[in-house]
Amino acid sequence: MNFTETLQSLTGKPLSVCTNQELYLALLELVRRKSADRVQPVTGRKLYYISAEFLIGKLLSNNLINLGLYDEARDALAAAGKSLADIEEVEPEPSLGNGGLGRLAACFLDSLATLNLPGDGVGLRYHFGLFRQSFENGVQNEKPDPWLTAHSWAEKTDITYPVELAGKEYTARLYKLAVTGYEGRTNTLNLFDLDTIDESIVHDGIAFDKTAIDKNLTLFLYPDDSDEAGRRLRVYQQYLMVSAGAQLILAECAARGCNYHDLADYAAIQINDTHPSMVIPELIRLLGEKGIDFDEAVEIVTKTCAYTNHTILAEALEKWPRSYLDAVVPQLMPIIEKLDTLARTRTEDEGLAIIDKDDRVHMAHMDIHFTHSTNGVAALHTEILKNSELHGFYELYPEKFNNKTNGITFRRWLLECDPALTAELEQHIGSGFRKDAAELEKLLAFAEDETVLNELTAVKKANKQALADWLLHTQNVTVNTDAVFDIQSKRLHEYKRQQLNLLYLIHQYHEIKAGHLPAVPLVSIFGAKAAPAYTIAKDIIHALLTLSKVIAADPEVSKWLQVVFIENYNVTAAEKLIPACDLSEQISLASKEASGTGNMKFMLNGALTLGTMDGANVEICQQVGEENIYIFGQTSDQVIHRYAAGDYCAAQWYEGDANIRRAIDFLTGPEMLAAGHAENLTRLHDELIHKDWFQTLPDFNAYVVRKGQALNDYACDPLGWRKKCLVNIAKAGFFSSDRTIGEYDRDIWHLGQ
């Protein structure tokens, strides 16, 4: 049967009379069958990538591309008068992640399958994700983000595992979601849930009874931890994930002939950040039940497990009060105590203990002591870990530390989300970059070719128009496509410094009012969610929404400046924003961003980076050269020194600089107060003057100058700008997750061996 006949056999009627929902379900079933054909037997070592998040995005187009069916599906549907793009709108986006951590995990699964490596994900089947963001009266509101339907990519299985929480046994059910590689194998994302979850207990936004564990355990990713019940619920979640996951791993390995003593020959377990850390004592406990003594179990688990550190922020290195673990996982505490005792025989440094003097259990410490590898996710990040944040551990275990710079899957972030650029590239350098991202370097041969540069300009212009159409349709916002599209889309956090961008926009507002007109209009686009209990982050959102209203109401300013905040930013929105971006905002405080991957996605799609020397920005700069990126601000060494000296006083910068003072005071000026809420604006105003922990003010003037240079280059040297864009695309190959996964496999996992 041809494609049309196959699809009609699934719908039971001609495609032309099918609804988009019927066609979506038929395509889902077709993809499932084709994916199943690519499942391969596992020999040797298999990876289990355990992560609290998998931000996989919509899957229909991605799977059709990876299976080589996209063009066929699009054409068959078009012949029946149907649009694949319209059918994609029917698909709900899975609410299984939030930020870069979860998106990285999703890219890694894609690359594992594409490289024909045996590697499955292990996580939780959240019903409502983080939350669905809406803006009401200028503030962020949170609601459930439902995505589970009767027909989902994640298929229910009959496989269950008992999990003991607070002395009570729960039954974890396994759901399997097929992960299809590009011209590669099919792996699996294993997601655990409870049959007893009750979605109806959620009320008043995202409030629910945090003590009703049987009903609430997998409702939300990262339950609000502003109270003790929420913090304990996170421990419950983490143990459900690792206990069910560990039982799955042991069962699968045993089915392949493992006798448990040789577990490390059958499994490689990657602990993605500290959320899955309890897999270490849980595996030791389960191996003990198989008759393996403690010392051997520790040796087996250490050889099997590896840990990825994703943060330099101390607040994000999880430390649970012992009382929580005593209450929720009492079966693990004797094991954790023995691990702490064993760790103390290796070092006298109290700072490296697992259980500290305040009776807190340090998850990252347990990970480093009892895995065989600890990696950072960008060269700078790993050096900071070794020389600063985890220096004591590096001195104790230098052989464990290594770097694996993050990457992104080009299948989603180029082939799927930017088909126009993909076609343009294939016209000039062939299609080899689809599997070998390094082939993008061939584009450098066209760096002086005005015809090619003009074609790239046309692609970007079309993508900007497509984004403008989408913004009008989904956000009811009209934007000027002749303006520079300046985009900062990432989790809302003070260290990522959306507040620096905010102060710049206020500065520009004043400059325009004073008659100092910019070289080109600017549309500044934000996409970000703030954690529900993160007050200042929500205040930053409010300030940006309020500023947007103030500017829109001022015709003198609005023709030069516009602020747009995307509601409910997710992967689908990112796929619209990234191809249309001119200037990519990567402005975290140097030394604070472990890597970042948004910077890579924007670069790949021909945006230029405005950024600090932080995270993977450093390596982007090395790849493209300083002339093809806009770097500003303090270095990581300068920032670390300033923290060590303890002498940063934001008030001195505020008092000593008229531009800074004007920008901050505008937050509580009459224009903003008339459009916004005094409580939110005053709190942010005071925070910037009296705290500013992430050093916004010392970098402010350098940011204003560098951004001005970028906008002038765009306006005054369009061909030079486009050449810089071409170089960025050509040098993006290093940031493929295929390269990253190849390095993990070579140095840590040794899969299939």
Model-derived features with residue positions:
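A conserved ligand/cofactor-binding region detector
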Residues: M1-Q753
